[in-house]
Amino acid sequence: MKTHTAISNKTHILATSPVVRNFLLFVVVSLILIKAMGYGGTKGVDILFISLSLLLLSAIPLTRYFLVIPYIIFCAIYAPVGVIYGPPSVSVVSALFQTNRAEAIEFLYAIPAGCYLLPCATLLTLFILARYSWQQPLPVRKTLPFWVIFIVLLFARILSGGVGNLHLVDFFSSLISSYQSYNQQMAEIEAGTHSQPSWLLNGANSNKANYVIVVGESMRRDYMSLFGYPTPTTPFLDHVNGTFYSNYISTAPNTFESLPRTLALSDGKTHHIADNIITLAKAAGLHTYWFSNQGLIGQFDTPISKIAMFSDEHQFLKKGDYQSRNTDDDELLPLLQTALAHNGVGNLYVLHIMGSHSDFCERLGGEPPVFTSDNAELACYLSTYRKTDRFIEHAYQMLQATHSPFKLFYFSDHGLSHRDIDGKLYLRHGGNNRQNYEVPLLVLSDSDRQRTLIENPHSAFDFLSLFAQQAGITLTQPQLPAAVTAQGKRHVFNGQEMVDFDQLANDPPELL
């Protein structure tokens, strides 16, 4: 009985100890911060490491004010991104630097309301810590046992080689490495813009026609009725004659990394920006135009806008600065109409549309969604397919009206993946599923007399080869890769490295 009483007394003393209460408070805070940093699964070692780090750093006023408080505030700011996209990556960093004001506002509106509870909870931890922990800082001598535990834990992780796997370390190392990778890619692109194209053609281009490339955004192939989705999302493409590629994949899961690898020569990790679709067309004697509804930021400092600058004539509907506005893709059509009316054959027109870029409902230009669903976001997303389908139809009709030979290409830069947020499915960027890369590719021409389905595997890394083939361009150098890729040998760039596409997880479409 005395033993039981002694144990109870010690337990009571331990539970009421300010040091223990402080530590337990930091345990709760660490759980919130881990979620805010974008990590789903949580291990005990991560909770212990963050709790100890916060407790020990908070004991010293200087580190509390210059490390702990800024860290918690940063986590609160990052929390909405972390919930949706996970820890920092090149995709997140590039979006941060290349999103204009209008797109930033759309992003905030597109975040599910429940996601804003986490940053509020994260900020709330500051007030809780200030009220119940920091008003009476722990004496240094009382933190000594925690220092011992922290040092033992740290050395154990160092010896096992697992320090980098700790969420706190991984978060900041991912942030730094992603920023460095972003800067490296931008530096390579900048250097490439000052290089000369290396195209050497075998004779003059005899295929005098007009070529239109419509570059889409965020469209998954499996949501198109053209490729079997039961809801009629692409009625025009369902019936028009042309060539349709049912096994085509993009190079990367986001615009920043996908389009430079699609529209310029690339080995996957790097790309030669000067050897791009525009300089290839110009080498073949085509006059080039670039009409874009995507943002032009600063002094032409996005990878795709740098390619656009190689064109003979270019026009951006939004400039990407504070004057950016929510322009509709349909505003590009009069530009194409005017150009076709004033020119003959021998031209390349690139139309870069917003397509199915989030916020999906904003892409509809004020029109109500074509489809209805309990999932309003999915209804708007599929309605953007109808809008893109109509855009392609109008461009096709304009080309037909010229009574001149033409070829119209359409592809999407990347797909999206489903995310379960608070029990509801959303479509967001990702790089771990096949559907992040499974996108449409089609070619419509004036000479099509039937519908042709190409089931052979193709990769966007070979888009230049396909375009050259369709345009009758024969190159002496550099040698382009084959337009058809053997099954099982397709690799994609996931933002960090080249990975086997066929080994990625499946993410099937949702039905309305």
Label for each model-derived stretch:
Residues 290-292, 349-355, 382-385, 407-412, ...:
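Short beta-strand segments
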Residues 212, 387-426, 467-468:
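Metal-dependent active-site segment of extracytoplasmic phospho-/sulfohydrolases and closely related
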Residues 2-171:
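Transmembrane and membrane-interface helices of multi-pass
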Residues 256-257, 436-438:
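Short, solvent-exposed loop/turn segments at the edges of secondary structure
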Residues 2-25, 37-43, 58-65, 131-133, ...:
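Membrane-interface soluble catalytic domains
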Residues 162-214, 218-369, 460, 464-496, ...:
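Active-site-proximal alpha/beta segments of enzymes that process anionic O-linked groups
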Residues 50, 54-55, 193-197, 334-341, ...:
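A long, amphipathic alpha-helix that forms part
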Residues 268, 321-323, 374-385, 431:
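A short acidic, glycine-rich active-site loop
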